[in-house]
Amino acid sequence: TFTGRKQDGKLIGKCTQGAMSTDLELSPGIVKLKRPQTPKPPYPYTTKEVRFNNLSDDVTLAGTLALPEGFNETTPAIVMITGSGLQNRDEEIYGHKPFAVIADYLARNGIATLRYDDRGYGESTGDGKNATTEDFARDAKTAMEYLRKEMKFKNVGILGHSEGAAVAFMLGADNNPGLFSNPNFIIA
């Protein structure tokens, strides 16, 4: 919460969250964001817009596949899972696109990635506002299955940020012996 007063055209006060409190001064102005990290084409890898279906929840997920040059079934592939709150495939915040930056780095270093819009956000369908972590885990499992069945990757892992890390560990702990069930590795 913020409590304060207007003084000399500024808002001056305290911002409090839980046990933390800090002084805060807000002034009007124009902020120009600099995002020099955002990858720009041409890329030394291939990108492909894809859609895949979570049939159990009747959700279509839309994403971007980044395929390194010379990829094949032994190329490592990573499903990228965003943190809490509905987000696009790039996990964009204030014009910064951390998942696009990470996917670019990985593709340049021989690792394929699949990042997708959360259900109910961007180009993905479904009800994201009422979705649970378990719902997002089923979406991520569908993404892993897409990489294994459709793209034929054999070494598929999960990279999860924030709530995405919880999803990654849920998938890793799933004891389903099916061929397409568990990630081969987790980055959290």
Residue ranges of model-derived segments:
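Conserved catalytic-core motifs of eukaryotic protein kinase domains, centered on the activation segment
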Residues: 90-92, 124-128
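Short, surface-exposed "cap/lid" segments of acyl-processing enzymes
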Residues: 70-105
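N-terminal cap/lid segment of alpha/beta-hydrolase-fold proteins
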Residues: 31-73
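Primarily recognizes the serine-hydrolase "nucleophile elbow" in alpha/beta-hydrolase
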Residues: 145-188
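Alpha/beta-hydrolase active-site loop
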Residues: 130-150
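Central antiparallel beta-sheet cores of small beta-barrel/beta-sandwich binding domains
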Residues: 1-23, 27, 37, 44
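Second-shell loop/turn segments in exported
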Residues: 102-103, 126-133
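Conserved alpha/beta-hydrolase
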Residues: 101-123
